[in-house]
Regions:
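Glycine-rich phosphate/pyrophosphate-binding loop and the adjoining helix
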Residues: 111-169
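Residue-level signal for short, function-critical loop segments
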Residues: 58, 104, 142
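Amphipathic coiled-coil/heptad-repeat helices and related helical stalk/stem segments
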Residues: 38-39, 85, 120, 158
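Hydrophobic/aromatic beta-strand patches that form the interior of the parallel beta-sheet core
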Residues: 1, 53, 99-101, 137-139
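N-terminal beta1-alpha1-beta2 submodule of the flavodoxin-like/Rossmannoid cofactor-binding fold
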Residues: 1-76, 160-169
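Short, well-ordered alpha-helix to beta-strand connector turns
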Residues: 49-50, 95, 133
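Gly/Ser/Thr-rich active-site loops/lids in small-molecule metabolic enzymes
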Residues: 73-80, 122
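Short, glycine-/small-residue-rich phosphate/pyrophosphate-handling segment
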Residues: 82-130
Length: 169
């Protein structure tokens, strides 16, 4: 799915109402049902995938809003997680190999990030784990800006790692 080109509903209005209706054990109105059906189609696409590849930049230490929007749309009760009063939140998706390629202007691998914090990696790890995907390998690429030599070295390192991962992906 290309999050910049494919349709993603805004997570508001009827789709938001549908989420909380389902969490509260209430039925949907017609408008809520229609809105939830869109989220369901997107979540089913993920549920049926044998493997997942997420390629994203790091923006302001986090993820782009479109990736966050996709996570909000697919993280729905009864589709990708459920709630049990005795056990809490439980994932509904089966685990599958997942690779996250994360490009950043800074170097978060060797510590040359000048004290900045990578908030994208822990967020994505937890968001995916919450719905059942824990076999996640992160491939950081950075720096992507600045002097040519560190950029070249980062690209080569990421390429080597991706070649290794591809053999079993």
């Amino acid at each position: 799915m290309n999050l910049w080109k494919d349709y993603l509903p805004e997570f508001e209005g009827y789709i938001l109402e549908a989420k909380y209706a389902r969490l509260g054990g209430r039925g949907f109105t017609d408008s809520q049902r229609d809105a939830f059906a869109i989220a369901e189609r997107i979540a089913v696409r993920l549920a049926l995938a044998e493997r997942v590849l997420i390629s994203t930049p790091m923006w302001n230490f986090g993820i782009p809003y479109k990736l966050k929007q996709w996570i909000d749309v697919i993280t729905q009760p009864g589709l990708t997680f459920r709630f049990d009063p005795a056990q809490g939140y439980l994932p509904l998706l089966k685990d599958r190999p997942t690779v996250v390629i994360l490009a950043s202007g800074s170097d978060f691998v060797t510590g040359m990030n000048r004290g900045r914090i990578d908030m994208a990696t822990p967020y994505l790890r937890e968001a995916l784990r919450f719905i059942g995907i824990s076999d996640v390998r992160f491939v950081p690429i950075g720096p992507t800006t600045g002097p040519a030599e560190p950029i070249r070295a980062a690209h080569e390192s990421a390429h080597r790692r991706l070649t290794e991962i591809a053999a079993s992906f």
